[in-house]
């Protein structure tokens, strides 16, 4: 959490420079500790962390966006969220305001590790590729780097114009 607060405050300290005055970014980070079997997740914005465990594909983070809470509460479907005109309007980001504590602003989780596949991704992926297709690709019997390529290809083939950031991590016991 301290590193995220430091990054946030460093970005904020550059706002006096006119061309940097609107600078901010989103962040999802996972710190995996194999010694204690836990993973700490730190999240601000609309990048996502998913877990695929025993055929169950779960979104771990909650989007800090206009549309995210509507999708999570069931007010709109995943399909509706993918094309919603406000889908890319974020409500929290790194670099918008100075943080002195940040514990309420930054979403954190501690998860107990089990064999699973983790997917960290930007909206360039999940705005274009349905979660069921992401799950199918992640379940493929190919190395993680090839699954990354397949996910990126799926987003681009669906007409993706945004940047597509994808990280796949296989955790095995």
Predicted regions and their residues:
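PP2C/PPM-type serine/threonine phosphatase catalytic domain
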Residues: 1-173
